[in-house]
Design a protein with these regions (language model features):
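Elongated, amphipathic alpha-helical interaction scaffolds
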Residues: 1-234
Length: 234
């Protein structure tokens, strides 16, 4: 058995926003993404109840987007690197979500509490070659697991690099345009400095109508977030 050291859980005060999170914090964009993934056709974005824990950052991480629709709770996370520990991270996060949604006193009630069913999805656009879609399970972390695990949590990861999941990209135009923007940044970075690569990608996408309105309104912030994100994964 591996010896473990106890570590104090602290908030990650250096958490930085990402272009993905900012883009899909818009209810219309988020609903479009949800519809594309689930094969639905909702038009009223107010059906989305946003429950992202804005002020709670646990274990050095923060979930990007959390929302409830049709009594289901969805946790969306964007990742630029492969991370097999997402099930464990989401376990901590969903526990915090349920604590927020449930009155503690009702835990001692004789009436069964009803909870929104959780769904965990990661959107991956790292440079490492990965399949279009895969699933990680919490039980993969267990040592000496025998038989069916008594606690399981499954995270589905969807590859959103431009040449992957093309049908999904077509069904959610904003996601497809986001993939084009990221690809353009990386293409530019092969022949110029990262700062120049990002700025030129933003200008070119605006000219071509790729995320044009979003980039015009948030140009400076998008440039800063993109540079920080790409630099972190060089």
């Amino acid at each position: 058995m591996t010896k473990r050291k106890s570590k104090k859980v602290t908030a990650n005060r250096n958490y930085k926003d990402t272009v993905f999170r900012k883009l899909f914090s818009d209810r219309r964009n988020l609903l479009s993404l949800y519809n594309a993934i689930n094969g639905t056709a909702y038009t009223d974005e107010m059906k989305l109840e946003i429950v992202t824990l804005e002020n709670a950052i646990y274990m050095g991480m923060k979930n990007d987007l959390a929302f409830i629709i049709d009594t289901n709770l969805f946790l969306y996370e964007h990742q630029s690197t492969y991370n097999p520990n997402m099930p464990l991270r989401d376990l901590f996060y969903i526990s915090s979500e349920y604590q927020k949604l449930v009155d503690r006193k009702s835990l001692y009630s004789s009436i069964l509490l009803k909870l929104p069913a959780p769904n965990f999805i990661v959107f991956y656009n790292g440079k490492r070659k990965m399949p279009d879609r895969w699933t990680n399970c919490l039980s993969e972390s267990y040592e000496n697991q025998q038989g069916e695990p008594n606690l399981e949590l499954k995270v589905v990861t969807i590859n959103i690099n431009r040449d992957c999941n093309r049908k999904l990209m077509e069904q959610c135009r904003i996601l497809g345009e986001y993939a084009q923007y990221v690809e353009k940044v990386r293409e530019n970075a092969e022949t110029m400095s990262l700062d120049s690569a990002v700025k030129e990608a933003v200008d070119e996408c605006i000219q071509k109508g790729i995320l044009a309105d979003f980039l015009r309104v948030n140009r400076a912030e998008v440039i800063a977030m993109s540079i920080r994100s790409e630099r972190a994964h060089v």
